[in-house]
A protein has these predicted regions:
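Juxtamembrane intracellular "pre-TM" segments in multi-pass secondary transporters
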Residues: 2-33, 48
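Conserved extracellular-gate-facing transmembrane-helix segments in secondary transporters
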Residues: 30-42
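Short amphipathic helix-loop junctions that connect adjacent transmembrane helices
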Residues: 40-57
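Intracellular helix-loop hinge segments at the cytoplasmic ends of transmembrane helices
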Residues: 44, 136-147
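Loop-to-transmembrane helix entry/capping segments in MFS-fold secondary transporters
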Residues: 54-55, 147-157
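Transmembrane alpha-helical segments of major facilitator superfamily
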Residues: 59-68, 128
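Helix-to-loop junctions at the C-terminal end of transmembrane segments
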Residues: 70-89
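C-terminal transmembrane helical hairpin of 12-TM major facilitator-type secondary transporters
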Residues: 89-139
C-alpha cells in the first residue's frame, strides 16, 4: 500500500468549483436514497410483508445487482438516445433527481391506496433503479467533466 506523502486538510477536500461541490452534495443524497431503498427498505419489505425467505431475498437482490450493472453498462448508449447525441449537463442530473422524487412519491401513493404491494413496491423500485443507474452515470460523467485534471483523484474520490 502506498501512503500519501502530504496529508490533505479537510478544507482542501472541498473543491474550488461550485459545480463540483453541488454535484458532490447531490451524489451524497443520491446514494443515500439508494441505500435506504435497496439496503434497508426492500430486503425488509420482501421478508416481512411478502414472507420471502432469507435465500429468496438474497437471490432477488443478487439478480437486482446484476441488472443494475447491466443498466450501468448500457447507460452511455441509453443516454445518447435520450439526449439525441448530446452530452449530459447539470440539467440532466437535475431532471434525473426530479424523476426519482416523482417515482418515490408514486410508490408511496400506490402503497397508500392499497394497490398490490408486489406491483407497487417491486415494480416501482425497478423503475427507480433504472432511473437511478442512468442518473448515477450522469453524475460520474459530470464530476469528471467539471474537474481539472490535477484534481481528478481528489474530486472523484
Amino acid at each position: 500500500m502506498v501512503l500519501a506523502k502530504v496529508k490533505v486538510k479537510f478544507s482542501q477536500i472541498l473543491s474550488k468549483s461550485r459545480e463540483v461541490n453541488l454535484l458532490s452534495a447531490a451524489r451524497m443524497f443520491l446514494f443515500g436514497s439508494r441505500d435506504i431503498w435497496f439496503v434497508v427498505g426492500l430486503p425488509v419489505f420482501l421478508s416481512a410483508s411478502l414472507g420471502w425467505s432469507h435465500a429468496e431475498v438474497g437471490g432477488f437482490l443478487a439478480l437486482w445487482v446484476i441488472g443494475y450493472g447491466g443498466v450501468q453498462a448500457l447507460a452511455p448508449k441509453l443516454l445518447d438516445r435520450c439526449l439525441g447525441g448530446g452530452t449530459p449537463r447539470g440539467g440532466t442530473a437535475t431532471l434525473g433527481a426530479f424523476v426519482l422524487a416523482i417515482l418515490t412519491g408514486l410508490i408511496a401513493l400506490g402503497v397508500g391506496l392499497d394497490l398490490s404491494p408486489w406491483v407497487t413496491v417491486v415494480c416501482g423500485l425497478a423503475l427507480f433503479g433504472l432511473v437511478f443507474a442512468l442518473n448515477s452515470s450522469v453524475h460520474s460523467y459530470l464530476i469528471l467533466a467539471y474537474t481539472e485534471s490535477e484534481q481528478a483523484a481528489l474530486n472523484v474520490g
